[in-house]
């Protein structure tokens, strides 16, 4: 698989001001209020009356912002550090990404509590649909013209908007819960699918359509996930994905945990990603704190992150092949994952959820003998991947079930916010480790695997090749592990190095305060995205100068990937949907947070 040069991706330039010049030339500098942040991109506030015009301009400009990367809200009412910003009770931000520019821009709009209305942008970016629904669900902000503004994370019967600051964050602040028979029947009835509410017909010209629930408890749904299918025989006429069954309020939890104590919660976002989940969070916090970690920390973090990329991809490979009917490989891939977890456990002390990265470093140094364990694994895995390729991936039945199935092109992928292997399988050479290196990835030699058909088979093959590249990266970590400390010498490193606590009373006090109350981060905003196991994962943090986050926005790759399903699978067979779901590689914790 070789690189596709159809889209040239220039070197990354943080805080790229070119778009600001273009916007000022088009609308005038007075139309915007620039906000200084540590997000690495221009952040501009606009008036609501000009919002849609500005966004349309960015979508159609030369080298356009083809991807609506994220869209969400903030309850600004309790925020104290807002000097220089427009008055706002609530705000909504639009994070736009341009592949052709390799740069981002964030547009914000302020709203007053008595007038929480915005125009929908679903006509500009189709993936705005779910994001706008979630903003309404969590904050109660209306989007005029939205095709189906309804609950998406919370049940249809839910009352209130959970991410508002006046909404309780603890169960003890609610009345005791009781489930009466009448309430149970109400909840069950609320889940009944109404085709007319979604613009679907019950009959065609010569046929009656059948409506089938796939999930929320179905092995091929890969979690608590429901898709309602409109069927003409075996053909999918239309479908409606239904998410939220796995929602745990991760972003709300972040407002009640210290910067340090939230780290274990990040492990549970993509629960197969392990420390890969910690990485964007601690990098974003380190931007707030102004911490520069030692080189050894970067290399250790990369090595462990790539181990979890391999374990996640091995699980994907086994279940993907199983979804299309082959039973044996999944037992082998799970056994192979155990060998990786043996190494991970020896280094971190844990297996699936180590919560091992720290603000300013990692939990502890590499143990004695780590290098032999890593070396043995690096030498062993490539031969296993060769066996999988020969025995399973070249199988004619698997190819027949997946080649040409659920295919989409680069343009469609960008419009729906698709990242990771799903984007690179269309030939788009965009991998953050190369395009926007972080944690020292620019010092490693590896290739970005690509395919060109964008179908279910290509998505699988890209991930298999990614495992080979992860082995290359881990091998370079093994051969070039620097000497030095495993934590940064910085006042906000948490926990601080403990060796000095027995010698300096000030260090002991700092250690106690940072572990109990948590470190105090400067008031600002920061942002970090990484190339995670399932696509681009990012944390957008807002600090109000306290020990806890004022607002934590977690953007996960699986969320837009599931929203894309209807546009890809219409007109296909039910069996093709099963292959498509397997090829996406998602877990519902990553979708629902």
Curated annotation (Swiss-Prot):
Its main location: membrane. Pfam families: Complex1_30kDa (PF00329), Complex1_49kDa (PF00346). It is an enzyme of class 7 (translocase). This is NADH-quinone oxidoreductase subunit C/D. Residues 1-184 are annotated as: NADH dehydrogenase I subunit C. It catalyses: a quinone + NADH + 5 H(+)(in) = a quinol + NAD(+) + 4 H(+)(out). GO terms for cellular component: NADH dehydrogenase complex; plasma membrane. In the N-terminal section; belongs to the complex I 30 kDa subunit family. GO terms for molecular function: NAD binding; NADH dehydrogenase (ubiquinone) activity; NADH:ubiquinone reductase (non-electrogenic) activity; quinone binding. It comes from Pseudomonas putida (strain ATCC 700007 / DSM 6899 / JCM 31910 / BCRC 17059 / LMG 24140 / F1). Its EC number is 7.1.1.-. InterPro entries: NADH_DH_suC, NADH_DH_suCD, NADH_Q_OxRdtase_suD, NADH_quin_OxRdtase_su_C/D-like, NADH_UbQ_OxRdtase_30kDa_su, NADH_UbQ_OxRdtase_49kDa_CS, NDH1_su_D/H, NiFe-Hase_large. Keywords: Cell inner membrane, Cell membrane, Membrane, Multifunctional enzyme, NAD, Quinone, Translocase, Transport, Ubiquinone. NDH-1 shuttles electrons from NADH, via FMN and iron-sulfur (Fe-S) centers, to quinones in the respiratory chain. The immediate electron acceptor for the enzyme in this species is believed to be ubiquinone. Couples the redox reaction to proton translocation (for every two electrons transferred, four hydrogen ions are translocated across the cytoplasmic membrane), and thus conserves the redox energy in a proton gradient. NDH-1 is composed of 13 different subunits. Subunits NuoB, CD, E, F, and G constitute the peripheral sector of the complex. It is a peripheral membrane protein. Coiled coil: none annotated. It is found in: Cell inner membrane. The keyword Cell wall biogenesis/degradation does not apply. Residues 208-593 are annotated as: NADH dehydrogenase I subunit D.
């Amino acid at each position: 698989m070789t690189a596709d040069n159809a889209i040239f991706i220039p070197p990354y330039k943080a805080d790229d001001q070119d778009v600001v010049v273009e916007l000022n030339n088009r609308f005038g500098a007075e139309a915007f209020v620039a906000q200084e942040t540590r997000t690495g991109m221009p952040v501009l506030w606009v008036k609501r009356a000009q919002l849609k015009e500005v966004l349309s301009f960015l979508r159609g400009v030369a080298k356009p912002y083809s991807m609506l990367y994220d869209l969400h809200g903030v309850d600004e009412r309790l925020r104290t550090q807002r000097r220089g910003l427009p008055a706002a009770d609530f705000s909504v931000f639009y994070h736009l990404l341009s592949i052709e520019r390799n740069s981002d821009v964030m547009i914000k709009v302020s709203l007053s509590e008595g007038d929480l209305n915005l125009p929908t942008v679903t006509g500009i970016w189709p993936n705005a649909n779910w994001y706008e629904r979630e903003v309404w669900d969590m904050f109660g902000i209306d989007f005029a013209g939205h095709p189906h503004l309804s609950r998406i994370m919370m049940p249809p019967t839910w009352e209130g908007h959970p991410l508002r600051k006046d909404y309780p964050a603890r169960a003890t602040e609610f009345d005791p819960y009781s489930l009466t028979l009448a309430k149970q029947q109400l909840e069950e009835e609320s889940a009944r699918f109404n085709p007319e509410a979604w613009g679907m017909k019950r009959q065609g010209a010569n046929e009656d359509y059948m409506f089938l629930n796939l999930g929320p408890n179905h092995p091929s749904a890969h979690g608590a996930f429901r898709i309602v299918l409109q069927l003409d025989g075996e053909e999918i006429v239309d479908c409606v994905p239904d998410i939220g069954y796995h929602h745990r309020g991760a972003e709300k939890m972040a407002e009640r945990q210290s910067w340090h104590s939230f780290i274990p919660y990040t492990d549970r976002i993509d629960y197969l990603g392990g420390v890969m989940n910690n990485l964007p969070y601690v990098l974003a916090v380190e931007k707030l704190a102004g911490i520069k970690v030692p080189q050894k920390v970067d290399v250790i973090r990369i090595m462990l992150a790539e181990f979890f990329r391999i374990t996640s991809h091995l699980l994907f490979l086994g279940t993907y092949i199983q979804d299309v009917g082959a039973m044996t490989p999944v037992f082998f891939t799970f056994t192979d994952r155990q060998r990786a977890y043996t190494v991970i456990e020896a280094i971190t002390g844990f297996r699936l959820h180590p919560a091992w990265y720290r603000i300013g470093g990692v939990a502890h140094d590499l143990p004695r003998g780590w290098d032999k364990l890593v070396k043995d694994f690096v030498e062993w895995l490539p031969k296993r991947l060769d066996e999988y390729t020969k025995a399973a991936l070249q199988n004619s039945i698997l190819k027949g079930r997946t080649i040409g199935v659920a295919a989409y092109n680069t343009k469609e992928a960008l419009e729906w916010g698709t990242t990771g292997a799903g984007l690179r399988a269309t030939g788009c050479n965009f991998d953050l480790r190369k395009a926007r290196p972080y944690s020292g990835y620019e010092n490693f030699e590896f290739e970005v695997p690509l395919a060109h058909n964008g179908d279910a088979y290509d998505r699988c093959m890209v991930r298999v090749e990614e495992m080979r590249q992860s082995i290359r990266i881990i091998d370079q970590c093994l051969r070039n592990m620097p000497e030095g400390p495993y934590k940064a010498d910085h006042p906000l490193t948490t926990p601080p190095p403990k060796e000095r606590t027995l010698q300096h009373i000030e260090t002991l006090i700092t250690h106690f305060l940072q572990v109990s109350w948590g470190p105090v981060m400067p008031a600002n905003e920061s942002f970090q995205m990484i190339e995670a196991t399932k696509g681009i994962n990012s944390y957008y943090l807002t600090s109000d100068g306290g020990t806890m986050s004022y607002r934590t926005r977690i953007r996960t790759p699986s969320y837009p990937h599931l929203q894309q399903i209807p546009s890809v699978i219409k007109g296909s067979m039910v069996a093709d949907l099963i292959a498509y779901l397997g090829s996406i590689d998602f877990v519902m914790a990553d979708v629902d947070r």
